[in-house]
Amino acid sequence: MLMKVSQFFLATVKETPADAVLASHQLMIRAGMLRKLASGLYTWLPLGLRVLQKVADVVREEMNRAGALELLMPIVQPASLWQESGRWEAYGAELLRIMDRHQNGFCFGPTHEEVITDIARQELKSYKQLPLNFYQIQTKFRDEIRPRFGVMRSREFLMKDAYSFDLDEKGMQAAYEKMFDAYRRIFTRLGLNFRAVLADTGAIGGDYSHEFQVLADVGEDTVVYSDESDYAANIEKAAAQAPQGERVKPVAEMKKIATPGVRTIKQLADKANILPEKGVKTLIVKGDESSLIALILRGDHELNDVKAQHLPGVAFPLQFADEKEIREAIGCGPGSLGPVNLPIPFIVDRDAAQLVDFSCGANEDDFHWINVNWERDVPLGSVADIRKVVEGDISPDGKGRLRFARGIEVGQVFQLGDKYSRKMNATVVDELGKSRYLQMGCYGIGVSRTVAAAIEQNHDERGIIWPMPMAPFFIALVPVNMHKSYRVREACEKLYNELIDAGYEVLWDDRKERPGVMFADMDLIGIPHRLVISESGLDRGIVEYKARKSKEAENVSLENVLSVFR
């Protein structure tokens, strides 16, 4: 493809936008990749679109290699499908709902499980048509409450979403593994430093999921990993090793103490001279059918909201009871709660269940119990893992300690099972003539977010440093004083054509600009290789070559320039 800057729309700017916090957002605006239209809405300019298409091409190649079939579904979806699946209300305010002129309800698709399941139930009748995997690369819309960080968290974005259909769970798991491997190939080919981590299934649903996290200090997600094994999980899903051994026998007698004004674990620890990890805290959440449930944790631990909302009987999404509801149900404020004589059901975190001689609220304002013991003083009841892990916990596989890193989620894969096929009655007949619900998987990649994540991993003070597969151009050809020198123009023309004929994507900066301006722009937009032709270089038969990653330039023979790239 022939491309000179005079024929291209190079929209670089020096100023950093006031609302751009992340380096990726700043550089995408300054490099002329994006322009903001409204909150969370961006126009991709020609330079940015070239990068976006490079990422989409890699995704498409690997999806095709894995046997997936490309299709394209409507962005606008009928409300009736989402009502069938139960997500019309459950999805929340991020689902942009609209009405047409006939007062029919629709939404802008944030994802396409309902649409693809509708296609499957109409088109798939027999097990002989399986397995199948469909994918699309298409614009999505989610009405984010606070769009920020450019295309890292925008309302409109480009996404690859795929959906597999199998007869049974074994087939679904095989499809999942195939997509998992395809995702590894995609992000490896794109040159990204990433981790595949266990993840919560969120609003999509299903029983099993992995996220693909690009490691970056500015990432919104916390990636938890073992320093001695392959274990890795999003902090929402991460677990520590279960407590080992039996609870020791009680030592002291339970005693009620007055604690006027004490409302927190820290205040109780100071008042009673106990360690926070020797106390429990009690949180009240809403259960199914307007009931209340207490969640009990060790005093120094924090509740993992995602784990909690998946507990049997707990409302999804998680909702905390307010003080009025707590007082009506229990008779005291939130700072005086505890499991002893608690009139509502409770679930105990497995670490709290190991405590001996612990302290807790007495369910009476300004009073607490000390030296409380499970079974002796209060039945233990249900036990579950509901706490957030902390750095230094033992890995759940018993190998190493848990460490934390920041990550940007760029992809996620799900085993859905029959979550959608059962609700929408998508079935096929098996080899015995029996009707079976389709077993589904779904697999998403944020194509536009991947571009931003790559910049977060690959930039310096001068601009973007593109991984080779994502670069908008492979080589920047920069002449010095070309408009004053016929020799320089002629040498540029010759080399430009040689590079194009050899299959390289070249951007020839043929502007009437000072060399420093051209060098700065080429560094800003991140082209991996730069060639500089000048009168002095031609006198010596050389071209100046500089890799974007390198601080130093080197001279190469004009006759052997192509050998640099082989």
UniProtKB/Swiss-Prot annotation:
GO molecular function, one term: proline-tRNA ligase activity
Main location: cytoplasm
SUPFAM superfamilies for this protein: Class II aaRS ABD-related, Class II aaRS and biotin synthetases, YbaK/ProRS associated domain
EC number(s) stated in the UniProt entry for this protein: 6.1.1.15
NCBIfam families hit by this protein: PRK09194.1, proS_fam_II
Comment text on domains: Consists of three domains: the N-terminal catalytic domain, the editing domain and the C-terminal anticodon-binding domain.
UniProt function note: Catalyzes the attachment of proline to tRNA(Pro) in a two-step reaction: proline is first activated by ATP to form Pro-AMP and then transferred to the acceptor end of tRNA(Pro). As ProRS can inadvertently accommodate and process non-cognate amino acids such as alanine and cysteine, to avoid such errors it has two additional distinct editing activities against alanine. One activity is designated as 'pretransfer' editing and involves the tRNA(Pro)-independent hydrolysis of activated Ala-AMP.
UniProt protein name: Proline--tRNA ligase
Species per Swiss-Prot/TrEMBL record: Coxiella burnetii (strain RSA 493 / Nine Mile phase I)
